[in-house]
């Protein structure tokens, strides 16, 4: 199975970029690219109902978001596991389902604890 974090790390190294260490200029670049991909590419693809371009923009958003995570000096995989662990805690053990609002947003159950990401920030 693909590992997007490792794939992007390999690509960034080939581009001469730093990975898993804080690089403010590079971090800003990737944050700007997230904005560009979403506001320019994805929204245009939605407006045009172009599903191929929507997919391209969504994958590009993932790529530049992972680039930002690597450039921010964050532990991407550790943070991912922590966030997903807390997301899975939203699943009711008896029903195997989550509770949702009318619009589909998943609700946090009573006693839910937010992810502790402090240890993943370098």
Which positions does each model-derived feature cover?
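Flexible "arm" and connector segments at domain edges
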Residues: 1-58, 62-122
């Amino acid at each position: 199975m693909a590992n997007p974090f490792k794939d992007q790390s390999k690509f960034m190294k080939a581009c001469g970029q730093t990975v898993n260490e804080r690089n403010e200029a590079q971090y800003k670049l990737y944050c700007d690219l997230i904005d560009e991909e979403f506001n320019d590419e994805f929204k245009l693809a939605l407006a045009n109902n172009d599903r191929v371009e929507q997919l391209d923009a969504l994958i590009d958003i993932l790529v530049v978001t992972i680039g930002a995570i690597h450039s921010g000096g964050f532990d991407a995989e550790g943070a991912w596991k922590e966030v997903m662990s807390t997301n899975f805690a939203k699943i009711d053990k008896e029903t195997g389902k989550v509770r949702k609002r009318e619009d589909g947003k998943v609700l946090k159950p009573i006693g839910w604890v937010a992810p502790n990401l402090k240890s993943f920030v370098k």
